[in-house]
Each structure stands twice: as C-alpha cells, then as structure tokens.
Regions:
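Conserved catalytic-core motifs of eukaryotic protein kinase domains, centered on the activation segment
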Residues: 19, 108, 117
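Short, flexible loop segments at the rims of nucleotide/cofactor-binding pockets, characterized by
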Residues: 80-85, 109, 178-181
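Asp-based, Mg2+/Mn2+-dependent phosphohydrolase catalytic module
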Residues: 1-4, 95-98, 111-218
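Conserved G/P- and acidic residue-centered "switch" motifs that form tight phosphate/ATP-binding loops
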Residues: 9, 13, 108, 166
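N-terminal helical cap/lid subdomain that shapes the substrate entry/recognition surface
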Residues: 2-100
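Functionally critical, cavity-lining and gating residues within the transmembrane helices
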Residues: 49, 108, 112
Length: 218
C-alpha cells in the first residue's frame, strides 16, 4: 500500500462534535415547532452550502434554509469556544503520520473560520499543511471536489491519500476522489449501501494505526 497523504474530515472525526451539532439542530427544530427524525441527521451530516439549504428547507419547512443553517453554525461555535473535544487516538495518529513524513490536510464542510478556530483551540493546527473548507469548492460532499482540492494542496495524488470520514456523504466523496477511504463511524453506523465505498471501516484511530503498521487492507 502506497500512501503519501492523509486528509481528515473535522466534525465526528478529529473532534467529538457531532453530538453538539445534533443537539443544536434539535434545539432549533423545537423553536420552529417541529420534531426531527434520524433521516434529517443522516441527510445533513457532511453537507454545506446549497445542499444543506435544501435539506433544512425540506425538513424544517422554512423558506430560508440558509438562515437557519447559519444560526445553527453560530450557536455551535459558541459552544465549542469553551472546549474543543478531541477524539480518542487523534493526537497519536497525527504524530504517527508526521513521523512517517505523510502530508496532512483537513477537508471539512464547515467554514474556514470555524475549522481554524477548532484546530487552534485543540492545539493541533501545526500538523496540517492545508485546510480546505466546503465554501471553497463548487460542489459539496458527496461530490469529490473538496478531497481533490485537498490532495492538490498537499501535493499528493488522490489515490495515495487516506481520507478519514464518519459520514456517508463524506465516504462517497472520498471514494469518488479515488482516495483510500476509511470510515470511522461516530453516531451513525455505515449502511449496506455505503460499505462498498469504504476501503476500511475502523472503530477508531488506534485501529487505523494498527492496520497501517501491518498493511492490512481489508
């Protein structure tokens, strides 16, 4: 297995933020007098921009989904300003890849300001040579654009880059980019439909490091 790069999603992969994210969506839903089901959370995870707007308008039954999404992001950032919870194994895998000379990037649907704030708050910004926001590409996940851009920015071929994702939209994007796509499920287990798009499915980054060390591809 040849790999020269590693591209990380942010929410649910680097940081244990998905629960905060979901809680905030539910708070907003209650204010709009609606009850969200699991379908919304699955549809919204990993999206941004126009796709996020459409999902919000469909489930919230509002005419301005962009405004609701903006309010959600604002509230979430306020919560994260107090503490950015780093997921188990993240610091270890970053140090491991750095020792190996692997070039690393973050590719997240969140705004660049939010990504930079979270990375700095967690003290891990220095590991990454590039940070790509969903606002920088024409098409958001599940389109592959964000991972192709990240691979380009760190000077690596997509097929030689790991992509670490927790969402089905992200997995489809990583696979579409031709990357070695690793799903680390957070709150949503992989469906039978998305499993074929995963190179690996790992419980955490400790398992990722073990597989990389032993060259286990399946």
């Amino acid at each position: 297995m040849n790999y020269t790069g590693a591209i990380f999603d942010m929410d649910g992969v680097l940081f244990d933020t998905e629960r905060i994210y979901q809680q905030t969506w539910h708070e907003l839903a209650e204010e709009h007098g609606i009850k969200l089901g699991g379908g919304f959370l699955k549809a919204i995870t990993g999206t941004n921009g126009e796709r996020m707007r459409r999902v919000v308008e469909e489930y919230y039954q509002v005419s301005d989904g962009a405004a609701v999404a903006e309010e959600c992001m604002k509230r979430m950032q306020e919560k994260l300003s107090e503490c950015v919870p780093v997921k188990d194994g993240v610091r270890e895998i970053l140090a491991f890849f750095r020792e190996q000379g692997v070039r690393m990037a973050v590719a997240s649907s969140s705004s660049l300001r939010q990504i930079e704030a979270n990375l700095a708050g967690a003290g891990i910004r220095a590991y990454f040579e590039a940070v790509v926001s969903g606002t920088e590409v024409e098409r958001g996940k599940p389109a592959p654009d964000i991972f192709l851009r990240a691979a380009e920015q760190i000077g690596c071929r997509p097929e030689e880059c790991f992509v670490f994702e927790d969402s089905e939209n992200g997995v489809r994007a990583g696979h579409g980019a031709g990357c070695i796509t690793v799903m680390i499920p957070d709150l949503i287990e992989p469906s039978d439909q998305v499993r074929p798009y995963c190179s690996w499915i790992c419980r955490d980054f400790f398992e990722v490091r073990e597989r990389v060390n032993t060259n286990v591809l399946s």
